[in-house]
Regions:
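Short, mixed-charge low-complexity intrinsically disordered segments
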Residues: 29-43
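A short, sequence-level motif marking secondary-structure junctions
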Residues: 18-24
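Short aromatic-glycine-(Arg/Gly/Cys) micro-motifs in beta-strand/loop hairpins
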Residues: 1-14, 29
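Hydrophobic beta-strand residues in large extracellular and virion-surface proteins
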Residues: 4-6, 18, 37-39
């Protein structure tokens, strides 16, 4: 399980859990104007 934390250019924070890296990058690519993101492995 991965936790994806995304901060967009408006300062909004989006936190989501996904099953694998493919889904994590699909999520990241679906959001416009990303300022930064972190992908962490969680149990």
């Amino acid at each position: 399980m991965l936790r994806v934390t995304i901060i967009d250019s408006f300062g909004q924070i989006i936190i989501s859990r996904v099953e694998n890296a493919t889904l994590a990058y699909d999520l990241i690519n679906s959001i416009k104007d990303i300022d930064s993101y972190v992908i962490e492995e969680v149990s």
